[in-house]
Amino acid sequence: MSDPYSPRPEHKFTFGLWTVGNPGRDPFGEPVRPSLTPVQIVHLLAEVEAYGVNFHDNDLVPIDATPAERDRIVGDFKKALAETGIKVPMATTNLFSDPAFKDGAFTSNDPRVRAYALAKTMRAIDLGVELGARVYVFWGGREGVETDASKDPVESLKRFREALNFLTHYVKDQKYDLVFALEAKPNEPRHDIYLPTTGSFLGFIETLDHPEMVGVNPEVAHEHMSGLNFMHAVAQAWDAGKLFHIDLNDQAFGRYDQDLRFGSHSIKSSFFLVKFLEDVGYPGMRHFDSHAYRTEDVAGVKDFARGSMRTYLLYKDKATRWREDREIQDLVRALGDVPTDGMPKVGPYSKATAEALKGYAFDRKALGARGLAYERLDQLTLEVLLGVR
């Protein structure tokens, strides 16, 4: 009998070259694992039964590679993809590591840096499309400030808008089948990063030349750093038709960007996130933007990757149990099952409905006195999660 918690292609689980390829380096310590080549990472992901691999341009092709070196590296990568069946659903540009981007890429005060960032991104888009990417993520890790004396925030937003407009026109001119997904983060590595939350980007997108081409890529850790409910951000993006991609990991609220294995820390919120994605039928990739503990060797990295996918499927199973639990569903149905006899029906605005509502005698005390049984509902939810229901 097959394991119901083993990944299958329809689950669309993906990892980045930079995630499973992380050698365990951090700001306070040197690498603890050997660096894996992109080809080795593709074979590792095939071994753990992932669906796809994502990459920054320089995860695959070094920033100073010659054209001949670039072609050789990409050729070897394509061969590994063909051998394993691993897909490339998403790509992105590294606009944060090189010293040229120390004051931002698209929002840099230096027009030469802004122009270079556009050129680098166009080449990276070409590479991503060549390898099959249909989503292109933008994370502006350096698009911010340490001191507000250094930049005009309105001018910075204008520069960012102009860059995205340029790139959407480029994609259309090339006739690429590609959409953009913008990823928010409040801080780190900059003291403050512009457009710090998913909600910020949802507003910003509507100011672009081609908003239909641009959505968001919410990340658990980044919203938790702001102390926000991640599932609510995802729901807002879904409601707006802008949930083009998602980054799954875990994070203690208010900490530095921890990139913990998905579902390993915030158990209840991870459950409601998976439940939401499955309830609405989110069709996109489930991308794990997280890292194995620095204590691990390469075998531990495989455990991390397998654990990420298995945990998602465990939460998915719990969501099914929650939906099928009779007592839970009775409580949920009862929330809206209240007598409304005689109350004006509320729908689209009409003058008659407005007058009827203003004239209706609501029993305010009865409304306030009604118990909602949320304690019982939450307790039953915990019992599902803890495996006793």
Question: Where are the regions that the model predicts?
Answer:
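Short acidic/polar active-site loop segments enriched in Thr and Asp
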Residues: 51, 134, 244, 283-284
